[in-house]
Curated annotation (Swiss-Prot):
Family annotation (Gene3D superfamilies): 6.10.250.2070
NCBIfam families: PRK02565.1
Species annotation: Nandina domestica (Heavenly bamboo)
Gene behind the chain: psbJ
Name this polypeptide is given: Photosystem II reaction center protein J
Subunit architecture: PSII is composed of 1 copy each of membrane proteins PsbA, PsbB, PsbC, PsbD, PsbE, PsbF, PsbH, PsbI, PsbJ, PsbK, PsbL, PsbM, PsbT, PsbX, PsbY, PsbZ, Psb30/Ycf12, at least 3 peripheral proteins of the oxygen-evolving complex and a large number of cofactors. It forms dimeric complexes.
Cellular component, GO annotation: chloroplast thylakoid membrane; photosystem II reaction center
Length: 40
């Protein structure tokens, strides 16, 4: 936690990227199952 030398820590990038990817996949699958994403 104290190893941040002005740069963004790698674990923070991985966490944010993982949350974004999971969120996008969740929205995509939810849309496709509810019929909204069937046109994609």
């Amino acid at each position: 936690m104290a190893d941040t030398t002005g740069r963004i820590p790698l674990w923070l990038i991985g966490t944010v990227a993982g949350i974004l990817i999971i969120g996008l996949l969740g929205v995509f699958f939810y849309g496709s199952y509810s019929g909204l994403g069937s046109s994609l």
